[in-house]
Structures are given as C-alpha cells and as structure tokens.
From Swiss-Prot:
Main function: This protein is one of the early assembly proteins of the 50S ribosomal subunit, although it is not seen to bind rRNA by itself. It is important during the early stages of 50S assembly.
Keyword vocabulary terms for this entry: Ribonucleoprotein, Ribosomal protein
Designated name of the protein: Large ribosomal subunit protein uL13
Pfam families given in the database record: Ribosomal_L13 (PF00572)
Cross-referenced HAMAP family: Ribosomal_uL13
One Gene Ontology cellular component annotation held by this UniProt entry: cytosolic large ribosomal subunit
Amino acid sequence: MKTFTAKPADIEKKWILIDAEGIVLGRLASIVATRLRGKHKATFTPHMDMGDNVIVINADKIQLTGNKRNKPNYWHTGYPGGIKSRTTGQILEGKFPERVVTQAVKRMLPGGPLSRQQMTNLRVYAGAEHPHEAQSPEVLDLASKNPKNTRS
C-alpha cells in the first residue's frame, strides 16, 4: 500500500466558528491549534497547510483556571532595559483582549514557517460580532464536547 500524500488541489478548507465564552483558555487553544494544522482530518499531511479557517468570538470572556489570571506575562521591546510585564487579567481588561487567545494558540503550534502561515487562518474577536458571515461558518460547540472545557 502506497503512502498517501495530499496535493494542493485536494485540500478543502472549511470555516469554523467557536464561541469562547466560558471556555478554559488552554483547552480552547489546543483544539484551535489542532484545527489550524488539520490534524483532525484523515488526509493530514505534515508539510502542507491543510487546516481550516477558525473564527473565535467572545475572546474577552474566556476562563482561566487556578491563579493564572494574576500570573505575569513578560516580553522584551528590543531596547536595553526593555523588559515589560503585564498580568493576564490586565491584558484581558485592556484594549486588545484577543491577544491572550492568539498567543496561546501560537505557542501550541510548532515554530516554523508553516505555523506562521497557518496562524493567518485564525481570526479572533473580543466581542460577539465578526465580519465573516458570507463564509457561512460551521459552529463548533466546545462546551458540549467535554464538561472540563467550561468553567463557571
């Protein structure tokens, strides 16, 4: 039996809508990363962008377990003495709360050029509105998949 390798013409990308309200961040990010890579498909090929286009709404209403909301996130500006930090709670209450979800998904993907290409298929919105109604995305309900996915 020959090994199957997908061709670019064989790849079918769907649009998936995920409502992040009440969903635990790490569980959301791991499912989104799997969908972006295309590992949920039987025709998965590791060196090709096979994943779906994923839309995440209500990113500002995600849940964090334990004391992670008060844990600082560090980054460096690139300038001398440019180490900065903010807690995850401060970022969620700030101007761009969707960055928490984006960074969690980005860090669950491998670090190569293909992962950067796959990250362009992720769209994260803080509110419930999104401009992708024309693509008629399929709704993926994470809350009903596993009771551990939600937090009250």
